[in-house]
Regions:
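Predominant activation on well-ordered alpha-helical scaffold segments within soluble catalytic domains
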Residues: 16, 62, 116, 160-163, ...
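Transmembrane helix-loop junction
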Residues: 26, 117, 121, 161-164, ...
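Short amphipathic alpha-helical segments at helix boundaries and their inter-helical linkers
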Residues: 51-54, 145, 150, 243-257, ...
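Ligand-binding clefts/hinges and TM-proximal coupling segments of bilobed small-molecule sensing domains
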Residues: 109-125, 129, 205-238, 280-282, ...
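Secondary-structure end/capping motifs
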Residues: 193-276
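Conserved C-terminal helix/tail region of periplasmic/extracytoplasmic solute-binding proteins
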Residues: 263-301
């Protein structure tokens, strides 16, 4: 089985750990894990049959499904905004952001959506700042250090590195409690229907991977460091703490409200999206079957 992941970010650690801890193999799956940068590319790879499942961004799944494909979320990884807003040293309060430059990766992506949401929650209209597309998190941080940017939306471990440079964490969005289906494990309805035993092994392995992630910090950190290509273990520890403790659920259900939020956003360009049921974007039958058996609860006893 070929499984993809769409970014080298801490949000994708559970799928790396499931592979590296040997949990796919334990459940009888021979898995080749492939990095496929970007949600749209990952969706296309799934539709072409090159991969059978992908850990990827929610907006890409919703967009693909709205276009008529059968891609669905079979598990949730990040069901809320996990991002943090960092600012240069001189900015310590939200109102100081007015008229300033805020960096995201690309317009329309999860970080861009999150940045605009965060600004509104802080009482600032997105039109009151200049939002710039600057690519990867490391590029955004470099732009801040060079004085070309005043704030950026990032994830650990970049947050830890920024704080070392004297920058501020103005807002930790994980504390807002907003439901947005930022990332999850996606597959196709066709694959699930034709290969349900293999799909069940996949979801069982993934649930065990999350348990490993949450309960075996040292081993998980080593895997995260490998995939993120870093030796900065302080930053890796911050990544583990943020996602394993605050973000990733023991029972990784995608949320209907989180997907509805994405549909509402999509409706700005595709009005028909407002009438689409979030349940169309999910297939939780595998996870529910596993959960109903008591398997997940037993892992944590």
């Amino acid at each position: 089985m070929h499984i993809g992941y769409s970014a080298q970010a801490g949000a994708f650690a559970p799928i790396w750990i499931t592979k590296e801890a040997g949990l796919f193999k334990k459940n009888g799956l021979d898995v080749n894990l492939i990095f496929i940068p970007g949600g749209p590319t990952a969706a296309a790879s799934m539709l072409a049959g090159e991969v059978q499942a992908v850990a990827m961004a929610g907006p890409a799944v919703v967009s693909s499904n709205l276009a008529g494909t059968d891609l669905v979320m079979i598990a949730g990884i990040v069901n809320t905004f996990a991002f943090q807003i960092i600012t240069v040293k001189a900015i310590t309060a939200p109102q100081q952001l007015k008229g300033k430059r805020v960096g995201v990766n690309r317009f329309g992506t999860a970080p861009d959506i999150a940045a605009r949401f965060a600004l509104r929650r802080m009482g600032i209209g997105p039109s009151e700042v200049t939002i710039l597309q600057l690519g990867e998190q490391s590029t955004r941080l470099a732009a801040m250090k060079a004085g070309q940017l005043d704030a950026a939306i990032v994830l650990p471990p970049i947050t830890t590195i920024a704080e070392r440079e004297g920058m501020n964490v103005l807002l930790d969005m994980s504390e807002l409690g907003a439901e947005y289906q930022i990332t999850g494990l996606a597959s196709s309805q066709a694959f699930i229907a034709k290969n349900r035993p293999a799909a069940m092994k996949l979801i069982r392995s993934f649930v065990e991977g999350i348990h490993f992630y949450k309960t075996r910090k040292k081993e998980s950190m080593a895997i995260i460091a490998k995939y993120m290509r870093t030796n900065d273990m302080e930053a890796v520890a911050a990544t583990w703490d943020h996602f394993a403790n605050k973000i990733v659920p023991k029972k990784p259900y995608p949320t209907a409200r989180g997907i509805k939020a994405l549909l509402d956003l999509a409706a700005k360009e595709r009005p028909e999206a407002a009438k689409v049921s979030p349940e169309r974007m999910m297939n939780i039958s595998l996870l529910k079957e596993l959960d109903d058996s008591g398997f997940i609860d037993a892992l944590y006893k």
